Amino acid sequence: MICAVYKSSRKQETYLFVPKRDDFSQVPEPLLQMFGTPLLVMLLPLDRKEKLGIADIDKVRSELAQKGYYLQLPPPKDNLLTQHRRDLGIED
């Protein structure tokens, strides 16, 4: 299975995986409006991959089969103040 991966023109580190290049027919319109113009990053052979960067490859495959798309959001940002307080042993 080969899928197309697009990055968002509006949201940093946000990617949309679809089963066919330039086929956004299964992606909800509100999501596409929020996503902005999809910019093709790569065509990805999922059947040859065992791992992806931050996405769970089994979840990507499953959502592509069930929903027709997979949306990868950026990882949560670390709260540096909370981390510093934890390092100092200060609890909230």
Curated annotation (Swiss-Prot):
Q: Which residues form the YcgL domain?
A: 1-85
Q: Which residues cross the membrane?
A: none
Fetch the HAMAP family from UniProt: UPF0745 (MF_01866)
How is this protein named in the record? Answer: YcgL domain-containing protein Sama_1929
Ranked from the top, the taxonomy reads: Bacteria, Pseudomonadati, Pseudomonadota, Gammaproteobacteria, Alteromonadales
